[in-house]
Amino acid sequence: MARKKRTMPAAEVYEKSDSFGQLPSAPPISPHRMDHIYPDSYGSPPPLHQAYHVQPARANYVPDQIARFNVIKPDRLAKRHNPQLYTKRGCTDVFCCFLFFVFLCGWVVVASLGIMWGDPQRLIYPTDSEFRRCGVDQGGYYNFRYLQFFQIFTNKDIFSKRPYLFYFDLTKCISYATALGGCQTTQICVEECPSQYFSYLQLRTASAAEIQNKMKNVVYCTDDVDKSTVTTFVALQSLVQRGKCVSYTVKSVPVLQRCFPEAIFNAVDNVNTVLNSSNSLDYLKRTFGDDALIPQDIQITGQSSEVMKSVVEDQPVTHKVIHDLSQTWWQTLILIFAAGMLSFIWTVIMRLLGSLLIWLSIFLVLGALGFGAGFSWIKWNNLKATGAIDDYSFHPAFDAYFEMPTTWFVVAIATSVLLVIFLLVILFIRQRISIACALISESSKAIGSMMSTLVFPLFPFLLHIGVFALWGSIAIWLASSGQEICRMKETNGQVYNTSTKCDCNAKLAGCTYVGIEKESDTIFWLQVYNLFAFFWLSCFVTALGDIALAGAFASYYWARDKRHDVPTFPVIRALNRAMRYNLGSIAFGSLIIAIVKIIRVMLEYIDHKLGKSENKAVKWFLMCLKCCFWCLEMFFKFLTKNAYIMIAIYGKNFFSSAKDSFLLITRNIVRTVVVHKVAGILLFLGKAMITLGMGILSFYYFSGRWVVEGVPKVDLYYYFVPIVIVVIGSYFMADLFFDVYEMAVDTTFICFLEDSEQNDGSLERPYFMSQKLLEILGTKNEIPLHTK
């Protein structure tokens, strides 16, 4: 709506001629600045349409110090075109925000169902053959149904005192993975793992008192066996043959609350000593007789003595790794911290020498192509001169093909063509490369002026950890969900699927635990919902971090005076602005990525289900779909990232921002490709050099090749353990810094494109870009403004 004409003080009116009373025409309408607010006050911007456009007074017309009215200086006029300061903002994509809230409520319901139906102890604690959890006092009669009645009340925590799972026949579950998943042998919960080698044949000639002593301290039996009644070898042999008592034991150690032979994980004694002393089953078999129920030592270990020596020595590998970490933790932290400092220094180097590094990389590529082409032509000419012939039949020696002139002729042609193409491309886009160098330099300045941007990524990183923990916890609860089923024994002592159900918590004789009954389809779809929630929230957290950083870097770009106009705590301000107005848009963009991710997971699931299918057409179709959706995900990530930058600048909804950013990029596609490739080269060089450098440094230090005076030398079992940790930590630190740098480059680039398209350097629409960028573009502002 047009505003009423009002009389303006003469001190504020400035026309291009010496007479005054004439007002300049309104500036061209910007599709973005149509939303700007122009309050009716002298310190605020004037309306865009059908209103007087106020210009700053000339310095020689009304001096600032004696001006009666508020004189609009060039800097103040420029601030009026800052989209972050004078853009009308409101809540965007409210429906998506509401949908996101409803979805989170649904996730809470899924978590509640998992907690109500599940029991993670089923996955954490081992279970015996009766599906009783070792180390846990479950309650319920089926835990103690074979015990005397008084034991139920006097030893209620009996299974909490039996934390370890013992396997009767180790040869049936010697595989570690099989042991974790269960094996086809009797398993019972015990107070401690066997501490000696034993064969029941040792008791062939033993007295009743000796048998009673062994039954009490050495022999393991199921709970339904009354050991006090076993006084003869014949009775013990009958129990062993029926699988009620163990036929042998080996010296074992607990690993993940399961008893495994010490010979596998901790060969305390020399292998030859073990195999030739009383501490072996072979010795017991030679001494007390052979039995099919008692395996050989080699069957127990599953490996020969030579392999055992090479794999296991004085201590378990885990103990050695823990020892190494305890000895080197502070050196490791120092090296990782040094990697962070190097990452920061690299950002400074990119600010000072970014252009040099870029052009140096370009000239190195040109030099390599030129050298390759020249060498190939010389080699081809020499081979032709010596009369070499071409013979491309099969040759076992691959080098023979490089003694044929045609091979070098093809290589020479290829490298020459690549050299010409690369040279022409460089000549064509040389100005755009200069723009990319200047933008990278500006991004480095922005990071240097706002050091909080380097610390901020820790906030979304912690949120990512929280989201992952929530997803993992809910997934575990859902995976462990199910109803415990107990049934009464039949008269023959067996339990069938048709047997009468009974209450597992009831103290009923004959009530037997038979397993867990699950609603497989329901749990499957709840897991899908949980996984989709993980994808959506992860993308949401990433988007929130991106839009906060984009807002901070945009505030730096659009600030006329970089020292005074950049707001205090720019990242926190941008984050607050995003959470106040743009949560719906963030939810919308992250929803798109999450949908594509879940589709890719479903395609992988279908491919896994059809893994044994011989239908080539179906497999090819699935492969094409997976490839297409991967490309689609990459495209949407690129699109949403630029949309978040536009949202941070103008505060529009997601669709409008995505459309504006996409059209802006397509109008400047060559600049976009060049900037992204050039920035990618610099970031790759930075990550590679920092990670490789810290890896080499840690190798020389932890391997003892580099001795530092005053620092004690460390003796390690596996010096590669701290090296791997340093390399991973260094890459993480470099990635943390360079992700911020990448966002700074992308935001600065979008702001630069907007600035170059919407402004023309006039008094009405001055450029906000740096003087270096203005020189590259060959333009300037009519009145130089503060750009420091």
Swiss-Prot record:
Molecular-function annotations in GO: transmembrane transporter activity
Sugar-bearing residue positions: N276, N497
Keyword Transmembrane recorded: yes
Keywords: Glycoprotein, Membrane, Transmembrane, Transmembrane helix
Chief localisation class: membrane
GO cellular component assignments: membrane
TM segment ranges: 98-118, 329-349, 352-372, 409-429, 458-478, 531-551, 583-603, 620-640, 679-699, 718-738
InterPro entries per the UniProt record, alphabetical: Choline_transptr-like
Annotated compartments: Membrane
GO biological process, one term: transmembrane transport
Membrane topology type: Multi-pass membrane protein
Family the UniProt entry places it in: Belongs to the CTL (choline transporter-like) family.
PANTHER family from the UniProt entry: CHOLINE TRANSPORTER-LIKE (SLC FAMILY 44) (PTHR12385), CHOLINE TRANSPORTER-LIKE 2 (PTHR12385:SF14)
Protein name: Choline transporter-like protein 1
Organism: Caenorhabditis briggsae
